[in-house]
Amino acid sequence: PFGISVDLAHELGKHLGVEVELVVFDAAGKSVEAVTNEQADVGFFAVDPVRGQGISFTAPYVLIEGAYLVREDSPITANEQVDQPGTVVTVGKGSAYDLYLTRALKSATIFRAPTSPTVVDVFVEQAHDVAAGVRQQLEYDTMRHSGLRLLPGRFMVIQQAMGLPKSR
């Protein structure tokens, strides 16, 4: 594994003088569950009040934009137009933006893909109206699937932080 979370884990281990054992999960919800249940000592998460019930967070170390993706021919042109009756929004199950949109969307229907990396594939296969996700992932997905466009702006900012079980 590689990336900022892996680098931070190794730096934390050095600072504490302990060996780091990395455990990789394929979905954020599984990682949250492992830390909440003390099956892992530290995790790297998007800060969310629901997750905060079982996890204590550090100050955020990065901000990530949540964005929407639609088909090029979609009549939806702005984030404010997404929350309409009959609109189906595909999200990654248990992701930070799933938790946020579950609270924020009042009229649209949320459909949960198994993981965040599968959101756009499910959105395309199921012919849903909107895909929600991390901007960088959605930008990558527009290169894999033609005929898609990102809506301008963002619907949320995700604060990424280290977290440990509340019980500690």
Language model features with spans:
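Hydrophobic residues within well-ordered alpha-helices
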Residues: 12, 35-36, 82, 122-124, ...
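A local structural motif
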Residues: 14-24, 85-86, 102-114, 127
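Short loop->beta-strand "edge-of-pocket" segments that line small-molecule binding or catalytic clefts
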Residues: 1-2, 80-97, 108-110
